[in-house]
A protein has these predicted regions:
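Extracytosolic (periplasmic/ER-lumenal) interhelical loops and adjacent juxtamembrane/interface segments
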Residues: 87-101
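Hydrophobic transmembrane alpha-helices
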Residues: 13, 37-45, 71, 75, ...
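Transmembrane alpha-helical segments and their boundary/interface "anchor" motifs
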Residues: 25-28, 32-34, 39, 43-78, ...
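Functionally critical transmembrane alpha-helices in membrane proteins and complexes, commonly lining
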Residues: 1-45, 65-68, 94-95, 105, ...
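Aromatic-anchored segments of alpha-helical transmembrane domains
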Residues: 3-11, 77, 96-98, 142-154, ...
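Interfacial loop-to-helix transition and helix-capping segments at the boundaries
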Residues: 16-28, 102-115, 155-175, 194
Length: 197
């Protein structure tokens, strides 16, 4: 998915190809689903065992933030945006939190990381505050709520923000959560049948 995103974004940028641009967003959607699929068991393990979330956050941020900030500084220097107001919007990942929030979108590919960072920052805390044992019911409920919100905003915001807005793409990560949960349940259910043959 990562290579697909990079290739499609590059092709769309160089040749101004609208088809490749839409294809790049599809790959990003799949990337979000894959991210949720991979991180779901890690997060659920932390929640069920009531472990400190600091370890979860630390591991995630070590993998993503150093390279992000390095590239942000490099791009901002090259585009004369270092320490500008827009630069700090990228620092706090709020550049796509609302339409037209940023004047100079000098680091446009950062929108996808903003979605992931806000999701993994707030979603575990929400689940912990609800303090429920069956987290999957809450996850499915939130997923449907996000889909309804996304449908509501479909005709109210311009198309580019609809595809890249931080709080309009969170549903894809939850889809990965749900897929992993039900695949896990199916495998657990089939295991006794396999051993019984």
């Amino acid at each position: 998915c990562g290579y697909g995103v990079a290739i499609c974004h590059l092709y769309a940028f160089v040749y101004q190809n609208i088809f490749m641009e839409y294809l790049s967003y599809l790959f990003v959607e799949l990337f979000f689903v894959l991210s949720g699929f991979v991180l779901y068991p890690q997060l659920i393990k932390v929640l069920y065992k009531k472990k400190n979330l600091n370890i979860f956050y630390l591991r995630r941020w070590i993998r993503t933030l150093p390279l992000y900030f390095l590239m942000l500084i490099l791009v901002s220097v090259l585009t004369n945006n270092f320490f500008s107001l827009d630069f700090f919007k990228y620092v706090f990942f709020i550049q796509k939190a609302a339409p037209n929030l940023i004047a100079n979108d000098f680091y446009p590919v950062a929108w996808s990381l903003s979605i992931e960072e806000y999701f993994y920052l707030f979603f575990p805390i929400i689940l912990l505050l609800l303090n429920k044992e069956n987290y999957i019911k809450i996850i499915v409920f939130i997923l449907f709520a996000l889909i309804l919100i996304k449908m509501f905003f479909a005709g109210l915001v311009e198309s580019n923000f609809y595809r890249t807005g931080t709080f309009l793409r969170l549903d894809a990560i939850l889809v990965g959560f749900v897929i992993h949960h039900f695949i896990e349940k199916i495998l657990v259910y089939k295991k006794p049948l396999i051993f019984g043959l």
